[in-house]
C-alpha cells in the first residue's frame, strides 16, 4: 500500500517524492527509463569522464530555497557557463556582446556601434535582438540584422526545422544581446554544478525508506483514466497520482500528438587534453549539428590527455523511434497551446491526478524552476492530505 504514486524520476518527480517521504508518506515512483534523473542523467565512460547523456545541463538560479534544498543531496562547485559561437570563421562569446562585436567588426566601427548602443539603451545591460532589428537608428538596425543573421536565423532553422519568422518570439528572446563585456551565458546569482554529478544527487535524493523506485516501468501500460477515476491494472486506485509525463500520451493521443522537437547525440572519445576552449561551442550556420559539448569542462574533472565530446543534432520528434524518440522541447505557438489546453481540460476532471513538470505542463522549464514548482506542489499535496484526515 502506498500513499502516493509518482510517474517519472526527473527533478519534478524526485523532488515531490522526497518532500512527501520526509512527511511520513509512502511513495512509489514508476520510471519509464532504466535510470533515474530524467534528462539530467550522467554516465561515466571508458575515459572516466561523466557525460551528460541528454545534453549539457548547467544549474543556475536566483532561488535560495531551491539551492538550499539541492545542497542537502550534493556539494556544489562554482561554475559560470561560457559559450562560444563560430561566426565568420571566428569563435566569439554567445550571447553576442561587445567582445563579439570587437572581434567581428573593424575597430572604428565597433567603437562607434558601442557608443550608439549605450546611448540608445542607457539603462539596459541586455537587449532583445528583436528590439535591435526594429530600432529607429539605421546603424543599430544594421548591426541587429547582422547578429540576427549570423546567430539566430540558421541556428533557429536547424533547431526548430522552421524559418525563424515562424518561430515564437519567446524562443528568440531567450538569448539576448549583451551591452557590455559580460561573457557568462547566465546572469543568475547562484551558478554551480553538483560536485559528483547529477546522477549521484538523484541517488541521494531518492534514498529514503519511504521511497520505492521501479525502473523500466511503463506507467501507461498500467494506468487507465475513466469517468473521473484512476484505475491501476483494472482496479480503482484511490491514492493520489503525480504525473510528470506527456498528457497526450496519458489520454491515448485522442486529440493528436502535442508537437515537440527532439535531439540526437554523437559521442566521441579523443586522446587529447582539450578539444575546444569552452565547454560548449555553438555552430549556428553551415554545420548540420548545433553545438559541441566537451564533457569534462562541465564536470570539473581533471583527466589529462583524454576527453569526450558530444555533437548535438536537432531531430524531428517521433515517439518510440531510436533517433528522435525523446521529447525535449515543446513547440511554442498558440495552436499547440490550445491543443494542450484541450488535454488539460479533460484531466481536470480527475481530482486524484496532479500534473507537474515540463512535459506534463507542456512548457520550457529550467531545472531550478522545475524544482521550485515541485516543492510547491509537494507542499500542497501534503496540506490537502492533512486536511482530509
Which ranges hold each PLM region?
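Glycine-rich FAD pyrophosphate-binding loop
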Residues: 21-46
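Active-site/ligand-binding neighborhood in enzyme catalytic cores
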Residues: 88-92, 98-239
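Dinucleotide-binding Rossmann-like beta1-alpha1 core, especially the glycine-rich loop
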Residues: 47-120
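Short hydrophobic core segments
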Residues: 6-7, 30, 235-248
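N-terminal Rossmann-like FAD-binding beta1-loop-alpha1 element of flavoenzymes
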Residues: 2-29, 378
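Conserved beta-strand segments of alpha/beta enzyme cores
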Residues: 26, 50, 75, 210-212
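C-terminal segments that line or cap access tunnels to active or ligand-binding sites in enzymes
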Residues: 239-240, 248-387
Amino acid at each position: 500500500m502506498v500513499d502516493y504514486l509518482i510517474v517519472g524520476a526527473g527533478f519534478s518527480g524526485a523532488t515531490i517524492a522526497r518532500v512527501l517521504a520526509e512527511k511520513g508518506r509512502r511513495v512509489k515512483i514508476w520510471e519509464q527509463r532504466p535510470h533515474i534523473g530524467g534528462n539530467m542523467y550522467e554516465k561515466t565512460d571508458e575515459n572516466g569522464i561523466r557525460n551528460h547523456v541528454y545534453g549539457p545541463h548547467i544549474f543556475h538560479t536566483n532561488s535560495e530555497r531551491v539551492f538550499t534544498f539541492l545542497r542537502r543531496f550534493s556539494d556544489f562547485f562554482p561554475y559560470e557557463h561560457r559559450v562560444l559561437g563560430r561566426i565568420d570563421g571566428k569563435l566569439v562569446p554567445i550571447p553576442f556582446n561587445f567582445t563579439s562585436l570587437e572581434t567581428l567588426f573593424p575597430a572604428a566601427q565597433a567603437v562607434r556601434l558601442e557608443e550608439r548602443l549605450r546611448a540608445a539603451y542607457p539603462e539596459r545591460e541586455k537587449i532583445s535582438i528583436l528590439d535591435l532589428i526594429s530600432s529607429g537608428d539605421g546603424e543599430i538596425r544594421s548591426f541587429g540584422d547582422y547578429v540576427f543573421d549570423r546567430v539566430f536565423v540558421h541556428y533557429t532553422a536547424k533547431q526548430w526545422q522552421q524559418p525563424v519568422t515562424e518561430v515564437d518570439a519567446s524562443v528568440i528572446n531567450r538569448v539576448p544581446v549583451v551591452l557590455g563585456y559580460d561573457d557568462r551565458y547566465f546572469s543568475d546569482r547562484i551558478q554551480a554544478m553538483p560536485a559528483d554529478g547529477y546522477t549521484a544527487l538523484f541517488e541521494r535524493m531518492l534514498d529514503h525508506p519511504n521511497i520505492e523506485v521501479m525502473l523500466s516501468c511503463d506507467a501507461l501500460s498500467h494506468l487507465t483514466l475513466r469517468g473521473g477515476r484512476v484505475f491501476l491494472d483494472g482496479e480503482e486506485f484511490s491514492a493520489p497520482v503525480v504525473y510528470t509525463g506527456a498528457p497526450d500520451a496519458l489520454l491515448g493521443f485522442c486529440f493528436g500528438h502535442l508537437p515537440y522537437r527532439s535531439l540526437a547525440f554523437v559521442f566521441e572519445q579523443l586522446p587529447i587534453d582539450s578539444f575546444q576552449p569552452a565547454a560548449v561551442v555553438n555552430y549556428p550556420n553551415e554545420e548540420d549539428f548545433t553545438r559541441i559539448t566537451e564533457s569534462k569542462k562541465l564536470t570539473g574533472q581533471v583527466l589529462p590527455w583524454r576527453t569526450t565530446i558530444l555533437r548535438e543534432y536537432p531531430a524531428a520528434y517521433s515517439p518510440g523511434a531510436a533517433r528522435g524518440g525523446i521529447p525535449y522541447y515543446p513547440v511554442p505557438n498558440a495552436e499547440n497551446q490550445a491543443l494542450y489546453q484541450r488535454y488539460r481540460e479533460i484531466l481536470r476532471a480527475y481530482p486524484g491526478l496532479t500534473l507537474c513538470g515540463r512535459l506534463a505542463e507542456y512548457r520550457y522549464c529550467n531545472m531550478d524552476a522545475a524544482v521550485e514548482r515541485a516543492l510547491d506542489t509537494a507542499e500542497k499535496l501534503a496540506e490537502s492530505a492533512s486536511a482530509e484526515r
